[in-house]
A protein has these predicted regions:
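Catalytic histidine neighborhood in serine/cysteine hydrolases
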Residues: 329-349
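N-terminal cap/lid segment of alpha/beta-hydrolase-fold proteins
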Residues: 54-56, 60-63, 101, 105-149
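Hydrolase active-site cap/lid region
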Residues: 241-291, 307
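Short beta-strand/loop motif that positions the catalytic acidic residue
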Residues: 305-306, 311-313
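Catalytic active-site module of serine/aspartate enzymes centered on a nucleophile-bearing elbow/loop
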Residues: 354-412
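Short beta-strand element of the alpha/beta-hydrolase
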Residues: 150-159
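Short alpha-helix in the alpha/beta-hydrolase fold that links the catalytic acid
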Residues: 307, 320-330
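Alpha/beta-hydrolase active-site loop
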Residues: 199-221, 241
């Protein structure tokens, strides 16, 4: 172990590229996804990756103070919004620390405390759920719709840079707007699981998710036959694996594709992803991480998925080469459709590119509409089709005139 940017961990071959990441952070205000236009959410005071936790943490502290002041004078809706913002900022601040140290513990605990206020102020019931699993504890937030009979449940799987507190926002809950409950999960490699020392393996996320499903379908509020999985970004990798293993999944929506071979993310993208996964997996050598990454492949698994499935990818997502996504799509034997967002990268959007916050992305609306339709038994609009979405065309995925083709130069 060596000291790297003030943190103790194994030195990696790609660490020599850190100066390029720091330069991109200065120029873009983003810790990753440098392809996106416009400046990101990082404060301009951040000049290096190692500065992110402190400066985002200070921004979170300021937001928390505002939330407390607004709550003290009875402005409860404003307080809820600011507590949610503070919780998210604290969560982003802790994410970039790739070891369990005092700073990460402080920031993550502050995120949870702020979200406790969100739960108390929300216009519906949000339960913090703990589930015993494999000698440890898994956690999730269960957002309960105000329904009088058992309703569908959306099992939400965040990405590897997110926590369960980041989505949904209680005042813009796209699942509840469609009369569905939603459970946001901190599985292995995420949020509370990281702080508890639950390390990620190639297979334990789907095992943990199945344990959570065991509990959730026992709840009287939830219709056990209508449990759908909404898996975003790296969560889409885990969502594909869960759907291939657990027959209780009624439908799967997996946008912001991350199901391709993992060397695209770990070796072709910014080096911070390999640094992150050293922490998430707890391995001590780069060779061990490469072995785990190889074992994460979904090839040969996707054919076992039986439920209706939606995949969505940016045409030029560096972690998800389009031809490889097509190969995975063609392996599916279930009712399935694939949406390709022309000229976009990872965080695809039809109506709100560069949304300021994740919870505002129109990807949530589109995915949850698609899942609600599956719960209602509606036929798929584009079964076994690739839909090529060009925002400039003005057409969404359900328009009769939308293009159905795989490549920009084809007719369709």
């Amino acid at each position: 172990m060596v000291s790297f940017q003030g943190k103790s961990r194994t030195r990696l071959k790609r660490d020599g590229q850190q100066w390029m990441v720091d330069r991109m952070i200065q120029e873009t205000g983003r810790p990753f996804h440098f392809q996106v236009e416009g400046r990101g959410r990082l404060p301009r005071s951040v000049r290096r990756h190692v500065m992110i936790s402190k400066h985002m943490g200070r921004a979170a502290q300021r937001m928390q103070i505002i939330a407390e002041e607004e709550e003290s004078v009875g402005h409860m809706t404003t307080a809820l919004n600011r507590y949610f913002d503070a919780s998210t900022l604290y969560a982003h601040a802790q994410h970039v620390i790739f070891e369990n140290n005092a700073e990460k513990s402080y920031l993550h605990a502050a995120s949870l405390r702020c979200f406790d206020h969100v739960r108390q102020l929300a216009p519906y019931r949000i339960e913090h759920i703990n589930i015993d699993w494999s000698g440890g504890v898994l956690s999730g937030n269960l957002h309960l719709a105000n329904t009088t009979k058992p309703a569908p449940l959306v099992f939400y799987i965040p990405g590897c840079d997110q926590t369960k507190e980041m989505f949904p926002h209680p005042l813009l809950n796209q699942a509840l707007q469609r009369d569905m409950h939603i459970f946001s999960f901190d599985g292995p490699g995420q949020g509370e699981s990281n702080l508890r020392g639950i390390k990620l393996t190639p297979t334990n996320y789907e095992e943990a998710a199945s344990a959570a499903i065991d509990y959730l379908i026992s709840r009287p509020e939830i219709d056990p036959k209508l449990l759908v999985v909404y898996a975003m970004s790296f969560g889409s990798h885990w969502g594909v694996r869960i759907a291939s293993k657990d027959s209780r999944v009624h439908a799967l929506a997996a946008p912001w594709a991350s199901y391709c071979e993992k060397y695209h993310l770990l070796d072709d993208e910014a080096p911070r992803w390999k640094q992150l996964f050293m922490y998430l997996t707890g391995v001590t050598t780069e060779a061990d991480l490469d072995e785990i990454a190889d074992a994460m492949s979904v090839r040969g698994m996707v054919g076992a998925i039986a439920c209706p499935t939606l995949l969505a990818v940016g045409e030029y997502d560096p972690r998800s080469p389009l031809e490889e996504v097509y190969e995975i799509f063609d392996e599916l034997t279930c009712p399935a459709e694939l949406w390709v967002f022309a000229d976009q990268h990872h965080a695809v959007s039809l109506a709100r590119p560069n949304a300021e916050a994740n919870y505002q992305s129109d990807s949530h609306d589109m995915a949850l509409d698609w899942l609600r339709d599956r719960c209602d038994g509606k036929p798929m609009a584009n079964e076994r089709q690739v839909v090529y979405l060009e925002p400039a065309s003005g057409h969404g995925p359900y328009a009769p005139a939308v293009s159905r083709r795989r490549r920009w130069y084809e007719e369709g």
